[in-house]
Every structure is written in structure tokens, then in C-alpha cells.
């Protein structure tokens, strides 16, 4: 546990007492939907809330969740499927916030786009995706509803990253691939691949990346996590109100073209960044995982691993500071509807 202590900085106007920032190691995936982290860092919100955030990029949700479990990260942003599967297997994670709603798509060669809009055409085909992909769960659930066995009627192949999935589709090693933003747009720009289905077509508003941490850390440093969420909530307001600068921040952090970031983030709205915990959506996702036999048999009560109270306290603090702000009022209503 970090011990907050007081240091003194000599300024021109005199001596001012300043508290040392709490260090937090934050893991993320290289996608614009994780951009609230970048805004909170670049606009100084983390610093203003007493958080010294170090950012670490991962290729897959499985790798990221493993790093959280190994106590190499204080916060992880690694989908919904991976954290829930880790919890089912015994990981003591707490979901305390969110980052992303939607954001995945199925990519194919142009000549195959029309037929794959009909799920029955996936029978006998090969579909590539990143290990423990959130889109995988929604896709399998949609297949099952369409009367297709998601384990027997097609072959789903896991790859070590999004680029590998795109390459597999391009080379014909798989018939289709499930990737997250910006990779479906990059695949179109570089190779002429197209989107046949957005995963949100199967389940609108599905939860994607949740904010997770080890439960003992959350309990020991509750106020640190509360202040962390205050910074993310403030970043959400900036993301809503300043699209042009947000695009520049995302593009700089991800080293991608601004036009591509703008298209996915604002023009086409292929995802939404949102720090809300979305407990109802997370429980729906858990039930989908159980329905498609994605989880091992478990007696885990998933409710014990979702803590919405820290976010509630963070949002209350922001509302106290800015009682008339329409975006924060909207976030309050959204929280009440979804938790």
C-alpha cells in the first residue's frame, strides 16, 4: 500500500504543502476506446486527483488479466469475457468501473461480406479472434440463438493479437475474424477487408472493457481508486465536449492517423468510451457466458466481484463540485439506469 506523505515545494510566492501522488500501474489495449486513460493523463486530471498513472500496453485480454492477477498492475482494462472467466477460475478481481461499450466487428474479404451477414453461413467455417475476446462470447451467443452449435458447427481459432487475426483473414487462413477498433478500420485501409457484422448488431450496448483490480488492493486503497475514477469521469466529459482535441490525444497515444481515429470514435461511433461499471450489463454478460458453456462449473457469486459504490462516490464528488453540469447529470441518470 502506498503511504501518502507531505513534501514541500518552494515556489516564487513561498512554500506550499503538496501531497505526493499515489502511483498506479494501468494496463490497457491499443484501441481508441481506452482513450479516457490518455485524456486523464494528458489533461492533468490524474495529477490533479493525486494519481501518478503509469500506462502499460498489452496485446491480449488474457495477458492483461494475468498481469493484474500477478499484482503487476493496479488497474486493468481488458474486456468483459476475460475478467469474468478469470473470476470463475478463482481470481479475486473486483470490477469497479468501465471503459468501453461495444467496439468489435467481424471482418471478411469483400466478396464474402453479404453471405456472412446471415449467421447460418458460418457453419463449417473458420473464425479467428484474439484470446479471450469479448466479441467471442457475444458471437457464440448469437450463433446459439440462430440454432448453430458454436463449438461443433464451426471452428474458432485464437490468435496472439489483433494484427495476427487480420493477417489470417487477408491470407485466407480463416474465413472471418473478430477484431476491435481500430483494427477493422486499419484492415479496410491497408488490405481492403470489410466489416460484415458489428458485434453490437447481435447485442446492442453490450459491455466491453471493464476496470478491474485485485480485491485486496481495492479494499486497502479505496480512496485511491475513488480518485482514479474521478479523473476518468472528468476525462469522459472532455471526450464528449472536445472531439477534435480528443482525436489528437488518441492518435498521439496510439500512433495512428487522426482521420481513422475520428471515424471510429465520432463519425461512425463504433464504440462508446464510458467509465460506468454497468453492473446490469456485466451480469447479462455473465449469464450469456454460462448459457454458451464458456465458463467452468463454478459456485462463484459474481455479484461479490462487482463494486459500484466506489464509482458512485466518485460521481457524487464530481456532482458536488459541478452541480449544474449537464454531462455529469446525464452520467448520474445513466448510472441509476444501469446499476
Positions of predicted regions on the chain:
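Bacterial N-terminal signal peptides that target proteins for export
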Residues: 1-7
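Hydrophobic h-region of N-terminal signal peptides that target proteins for export
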Residues: 9-20
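Pocket-lining segment of extracytoplasmic ligand-binding domains
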Residues: 81-82, 152, 163-254
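Short linear loop/turn motifs
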Residues: 54, 62, 155, 263-269, ...
Amino acid at each position: 500500500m502506498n503511504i501518502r506523505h507531505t513534501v514541500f515545494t518552494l515556489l516564487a510566492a513561498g512554500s506550499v504543502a503538496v501531497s505526493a501522488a499515489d502511483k498506479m500501474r494501468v494496463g490497457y489495449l491499443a484501441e481508441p476506446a481506452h482513450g479516457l486513460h490518455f485524456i486523464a493523463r494528458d489533461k492533468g486530471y490524474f495529477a490533479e486527483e493525486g494519481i501518478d498513472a503509469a500506462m502499460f500496453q498489452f496485446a491480449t485480454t488474457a495477458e492483461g488479466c494475468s498481469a493484474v492477477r500477478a499484482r503487476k498492475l493496479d488497474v486493468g482494462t481488458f474486456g468483459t469475457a476475460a475478467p469474468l472467466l478469470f473470476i470463475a477460475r478463482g481470481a479475486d478481481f473486483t470490477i469497479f468501473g468501465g471503459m468501453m461499450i461495444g467496439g468489435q466487428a467481424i471482418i471478411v474479404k469483400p466478396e464474402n461480406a453479404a453471405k456472412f451477414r446471415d449467421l447460418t453461413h458460418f457453419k463449417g467455417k473458420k473464425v479467428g479472434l484474439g484470446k479471450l475476446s469479448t466479441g467471442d462470447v457475444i458471437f457464440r451467443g448469437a450463433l446459439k440463438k440462430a440454432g448453430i452449435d458454436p463449438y461443433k458447427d464451426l471452428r474458432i481459432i485464437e490468435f496472439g493479437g489483433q494484427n495476427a487475426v487480420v493477417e489470417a483473414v487477408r491470407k485466407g487462413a480463416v474465413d472471418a475474424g473478430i477484431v476491435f477498433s481500430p483494427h477493422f478500420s486499419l484492415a479496410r485501409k491497408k488490405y481492403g477487408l470489410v466489416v460484415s457484422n458489428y458485434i453490437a448488431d447481435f447485442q446492442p450496448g453490450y459491455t466491453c472493457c471493464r476496470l478491474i483490480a485485485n480485491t485486496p488492493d481495492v479494499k486497502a486503497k479505496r480512496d485511491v481508486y475513488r480518485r482514479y475514477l474521478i479523473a476518468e469521469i472528468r476525462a469522459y466529459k472532455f471526450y464528449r465536449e472536445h472531439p477534435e482535441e480528443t482525436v489528437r490525444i488518441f492518435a498521439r497515444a496510439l500512433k495512428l492517423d487522426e482521420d481513422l481515429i475520428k471515424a471510429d470514435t465520432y463519425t461512425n461511433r463504433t464504440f462508446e468510451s464510458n467509465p460506468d461499471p454497468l453492473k446490469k450489463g456485466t451480469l447479462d454478460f455473465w449469464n450469456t457466458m454460462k448459457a454458451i458453456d464458456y465458463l467452468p462449473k463454478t459456485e462463484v457469486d459474481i455479484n461479490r466481484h462487482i463494486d459500484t459504490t466506489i464509482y458512485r462516490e466518485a460521481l457524487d464528488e464530481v456532482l458536488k463540485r459541478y452541480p449544474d453540469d449537464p454531462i455529469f447529470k446525464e452520467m448520474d441518470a445513466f448510472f441509476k439506469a444501469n446499476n
